[in-house]
Amino acid sequence: MKGMFFCARAVVPFMKKSKDGAIVNVGSIAGITGAGSSMPYAVSKSAVHGLTKSLAHALAPEIRVSGVAPGAVATRWWAGREEKMKSMIGSLLLQCIAEPDDVAKLICSLIEQESLTGQIITIDSGQTL
């Protein structure tokens, strides 16, 4: 959270000078749904979403600020948790979890969107639907 704030504070003057720019913060669906099993994590991700929306208000119209809220992503974290992953996938509308490239492509598309700011976009195979 602090890292995102300080990073934005460092780049905003340069973006304002060029009258253009986009910031995309990465949170989590836990910041939207909450997570009783990991309350500090969920609270910190909710703060990321709040920072994103506040920056969007403060920096418009020159700078667009959006956020991505991934659900489960196929990473090394799942090693040794194959049964848990299989169970989770079975509960998702799309019956799959995102690949890291899926998240990266979404971030790139948000950077290119000239008419979008202040939004938190989930990429969670329908988990929060």
UniProtKB/Swiss-Prot annotation:
One of its GO terms (biological process) is fatty acid elongation. This is Short-chain dehydrogenase/reductase homolog YusR. Pfam families: adh_short_C2. PROSITE patterns: ADH_SHORT. CDD domains: SDR_c. InterPro entries: NAD(P)-bd_dom_sf, Sc_DH/Rdtase_CS, SDR_fam. The gene is yusR. Belongs to the short-chain dehydrogenases/reductases (SDR) family. One of its GO terms (molecular function) is oxidoreductase activity, acting on the CH-OH group of donors, NAD or NADP as acceptor.
